[in-house]
């Protein structure tokens, strides 16, 4: 009986030991899983807060007109940030704002503030320095501290569309003047039978290049033979008239001498 009773006890102990181990493992795994879940939730909360802080500081992308790509707005350089005037806040000191627009904290006596000269707004030195590292505008009124590129492009003169090489002068090109003046003397023309030399009627014309152009030699028109014969006849007739007058004078003088004798 004892042998038969011991066998079921050993069998129950052998079968119960794996179940016990599984139960113990389940008990230990539950808190571990719970711990991982809590850590994961904390991590999500941390990421959400960090993203909200970045958005509150203005780390956002802005679209530039005329460009489809979004770029992060760049801030002022360190030299420009240090050039902002520093004022000390006092209770009797009147400022436009009594609260920093970046951290939303009230100004305390003897606080060092930096003032934007354009709009006269004041902020904590650390707050405005952090803001201007990623912005170029006032945190309160959004006034640009640096003129935008579009405004600068409007102020710039319009470039010439025509390159200097392609510019055409409106004045006509002056033709080169030939300083050499060529004077051509007219050839000696033959003298006609009447003893009168025929001279050219037109004078040489000087063109704009300084070269004198002579008229073409015209053929000399000689007196025709009929005209020459007529002249000879006139001369002979004149001589005959003189001889007749002389003869008449001689005969008249002879008659007078005869009458007197």
Swiss-Prot record:
It is found in: Membrane. It is a single-pass membrane protein. Its main location: membrane. A zinc finger (RING-type) spans 100-142. InterPro entries: ATL1/ATL16-like, Znf_RING, Znf_RING/FYVE/PHD. Pathway: Protein modification; protein ubiquitination. Residues 194-221 have a biased composition (Polar residues). Gene3D superfamilies: Zinc/RING finger domain, C3HC4 (zinc finger). One of its GO terms (biological process) is protein ubiquitination. It holds the Pfam family zf-RING_2. Belongs to the RING-type zinc finger family. ATL subfamily. This is RING-H2 finger protein ATL58. It comes from Arabidopsis thaliana. The gene is ATL58.
């Amino acid at each position: 009986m004892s042998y038969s009773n011991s066998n079921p006890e050993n069998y129950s102990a052998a079968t119960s030991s794996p179940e016990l181990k599984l139960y113990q493992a389940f008990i230990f795994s539950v808190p571990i899983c719970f711990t991982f879940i809590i850590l994961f939730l904390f991590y999500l909360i941390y990421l959400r807060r960090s993203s909200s802080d970045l958005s509150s500081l203005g780390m956002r992308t802005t679209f530039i007109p005329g460009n489809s790509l979004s770029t992060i707005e760049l801030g002022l350089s360190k030299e420009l940030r240090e050039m902002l005037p520093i004022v000390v806040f006092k209770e009797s000191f009147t400022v436009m704002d009594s609260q920093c627009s970046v951290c939303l904290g009230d100004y305390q006596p003897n606080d060092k503030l930096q003032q934007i000269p354009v709009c006269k707004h004041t902020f904590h030195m650390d707050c405005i320095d952090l803001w201007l590292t990623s912005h170029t505008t006032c945190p309160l009124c959004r006034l640009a501290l640096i003129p935008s590129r579009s405004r600068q492009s409007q102020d710039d003169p319009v470039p010439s569309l025509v390159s200097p090489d392609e510019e055409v002068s409106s004045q006509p090109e002056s033709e080169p003047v030939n300083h050499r003046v060529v004077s051509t003397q007219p050839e000696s023309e033959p003298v006609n039978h009447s003893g009168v030399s025929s001279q050219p009627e037109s004078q040489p014309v000087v063109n704009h290049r300084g070269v004198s152009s002579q008229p073409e030699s015209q053929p000399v028109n000689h007196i025709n033979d009929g005209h020459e014969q007529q002249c000879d006849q006139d001369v002979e007739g004149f001589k005959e008239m003189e001889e007749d007058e002389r003869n008449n004078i001689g005969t008249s003088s002879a008659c007078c001498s005869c009458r007197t004798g």
